């Protein structure tokens, strides 16, 4: 049993800094400003479910999928970096509102009638929480743990789902508490957080790309 607790603790120590639920909360605040409480709670729950599912797939089938499609870890990092940077640019330079012409009003009403955009999978679950770094760590750790012999087989079987569930629950709790943060900072504060997070996401995306390129250089040098 101590081996199980040790494995769970080690997994959380490795994954939580990469998943960084607090960063996802700040991103959520920037994207969910126009959502009501019910919709924010639904997005929070779905994001947590998606994070759990992504981590499970990455652990049990990640290497197989990447080998099947010929995807390397550097390629995963570069692709994730491009997605993160694109999302950051959209947050940093939001689309300007159209002039209040009859055509603009008509289009605004038409857009208002559409369902609220689903932000649970992209960008909250991926790449913000279960991003390329998290997925790469899970895939590499899965290979190391299975062949390392440090833990008994039953621990290797039981611990990963518990670790991933714990990360998902922590994320859900953080996102659910974002409503109190929204009431505290107000609309202006949310816009400021959105711009700041956009800039940070662009920086993160560029860094992901740099890391991927450096890994390629090291691999083929």
UniProtKB/Swiss-Prot annotation:
InterPro entries: Multi_antbiot-R_MarC (IPR002771). The chain crosses the membrane at residues 8-28, 46-66, 69-89, 119-139, 155-175, 197-217. It is a multi-pass membrane protein. Its main location: membrane. GO terms for cellular component: plasma membrane. Coiled coil: none annotated. Keywords: Cell inner membrane, Cell membrane, Membrane, Transmembrane, Transmembrane helix. Belongs to the UPF0056 (MarC) family. Residues 1-7, 67-68, 140-154, 218-221 are periplasmic. It comes from Salmonella arizonae (strain ATCC BAA-731 / CDC346-86 / RSK2980). This is UPF0056 inner membrane protein MarC. It is found in: Cell inner membrane. Residues 29-45, 90-118, 176-196 are cytoplasmic. It comes from the Bacteria. NCBIfam families: NAAT family transporter, PRK10995.1.
């Amino acid at each position: 049993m101590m081996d199980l607790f040790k494995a769970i603790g080690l997994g959380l120590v490795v994954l939580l800094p990469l998943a960084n639920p607090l960063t996802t909360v700040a991103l959520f605040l920037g994207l969910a400003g126009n959502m009501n409480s019910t919709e924010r709670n639904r997005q929070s729950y779905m994001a947590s479910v998606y994070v759990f599912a992504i981590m499970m797939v990455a652990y049990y089938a990640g290497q197989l999928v990447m080998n099947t499609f010929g995807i390397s870890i550097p390629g995963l990092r570069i692709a994730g970096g491009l997605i993160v940077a694109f999302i950051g640019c959209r947050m940093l330079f939001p689309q300007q509102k159209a002039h209040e012409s009859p055509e603009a009003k008509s289009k605004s009403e038409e857009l208002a009638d559409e369902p609220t955009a689903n932000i649970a999978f992209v960008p909250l679950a991926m790449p913000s929480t279960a991003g390329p770094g998290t997925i790469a760590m899970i895939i590499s750790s899965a290979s190391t743990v299975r062949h390392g012999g440090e833990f008994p087989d039953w621990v290797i079987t039981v611990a990963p789902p518990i670790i991933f569930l714990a990360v998902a629950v922590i994320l859900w709790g953080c996102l659910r508490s974002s409503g109190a943060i929204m009431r505290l900072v107000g609309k202006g504060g949310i816009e400021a957080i959105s711009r700041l997070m956009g800039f940070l996401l662009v920086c993160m995306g560029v860094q992901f790309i740099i890391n991927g390129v450096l890994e390629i250089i090291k691999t083929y040098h």
